[in-house]
Amino acid sequence: VIDPSLLTTRRTILERIGDAFRQRDKDYDAQWKPLNKRLEGLMKELEDQQSAGHAMECSTQHALEATWLINYTDEWPRVGPVLDELELSLKNPDQPRLVQDSDGSWGLCCHEWYRKLEPTVDALQEKEAATEPLWPLSFMASLQDPAIVIDRLERLRISDIAATGLNQRDEQGAMLTALCQIIFKDRLRKLFVSRPQLQFTVSQQLEEKFTKYLWNLQDARTGYWGPAYKFDDGDVTVQDLSYTFHVVHYFVDGSGRKIPNMDKVVATTLAIKDQV
């Protein structure tokens, strides 16, 4: 049985996150509302274009970056230019598929480094990656270094929103998801070997160091992974279903590998099922 006190509800944590942003800036809501309203209108246009059969890959990247800036940061001066890019991109419904950029990513329509990870890892798993010309993954070359990887993850582990104006959940989750795929998916490991022009190697040391960090990050009481927050009354770790699903899914990946505390993962999932 999982101790209910360990299971912070999504509504409660969202309220506390909002309060932390307001503690930092009393005008937070006044800044957030008009930007979010503009984003909602542009998102409706994007959804309409996609429903009409247009892929809109570049627009989607702009939209996701704007969503992150508005909901996970208070960097308001950065939001307007990204919304402008989104609005302009929506005028072209026949956008070409995104190809690998000069930095090695498939994130041509992203500015933030970590936002390039997801589209790149996805593209590397498409059939074209096995045959088309490829460039070095220079933008993520640092992810081959175990010390850099662990240091970056550790800096993302706890968000102190009142001090920094940044909720690091999205970046931490993106990093964990990308690394779990890069390191644990046989398909990607084989691709890095068969396509040496990518200039990316997953070393045994990287796998060992990352795996050890992953198990240390797991809450042994619940079996879950999730972001942590520094509030005035102490730190709170969220038992996050999305984090946990991706870690379990990519680690196992048809390999038969065993997740530590899997019985706790099941018990916690059953305990929070009404919150999902």
Name the predicted role of every residue range.
Residues 48-78, 105-133, 155-201, 231-258, ...:
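An alpha-helical repeat/solenoid feature that recognizes helix-turn-helix modules
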Residues 30-58, 74-111, 142-173, 207-237, ...:
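Glycine- and aromatic-rich loop/turn segments at beta-sheet edges
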Residues 1-46:
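Intrinsically disordered, low-structural-confidence terminal and linker regions
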Residues 201-207:
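Glycine-rich, flexible loop segments associated with nucleotide phosphate handling
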Residues 2, 13, 17, 70, ...:
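Weak global preference for isoleucine
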Residues 138-144, 202:
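Alpha-helical scaffold repeats of the Armadillo/HEAT/TPR superfamily
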